[in-house]
């Protein structure tokens, strides 16, 4: 699943460090709804990236579980926004995940999609190779989830950006000799995704755009 909603704006209106943000009140409600969804599921393992927003989500969804931190599943790392030309900022946000995203594409001027695959696929292989578990909950990020879902569907290092991952959404996959993708993007608080027509990156840009003069 993806972590619950966060705000990437600090109290002063400047972009907050994406490595430090925690869940908003809405994000906590999304995590609580996911907890109810998983109430009847026996989870053998619960893992998250090492960032606060996934760890906080995991602790709400599975309060009795020991949370494993897997740094390889951290979110795509962008560059400093001040390093992106002002006339390219909007496009970098709203078109970050559009169509089949090339491996050489940089996320907000930082890490490439190929570099994302370089770290998440070995971690995935390590998880799958461990036969001691039957059901694992992985609380990750939108970029990770798109990469893993696309890999499960195609078996290739392909990144389908249009696999939207709303905050707090759940994906259901079976893995054995092959991958089976059973469900994608289940949002317990908004099953039909009627609360917004914006993608996650469009929503982030909408929040940041009024403060673009503070990004430099």
Which sequence ranges carry the predicted segments?
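Generic beta-sheet signal
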Residues: 134-140
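Acidic, low-complexity terminal tails and accessory targeting/binding regions
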Residues: 76-88, 129-134, 150-216
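GST superfamily/GST-like fold recognition
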Residues: 142-146, 180
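Short glycine/proline- and acidic residue-enriched helix-loop micro-motifs
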Residues: 94-115, 205-215
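Phosphate-coordination/substrate-recognition cap region in phosphate-metabolizing enzymes
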Residues: 32-98
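Amphipathic, non-transmembrane alpha-helical scaffold segments
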Residues: 24, 28, 113-121
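An N-terminal RHG(E/S)-centered segment typical of histidine phosphatases
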Residues: 1-43, 56-60, 84, 178-216
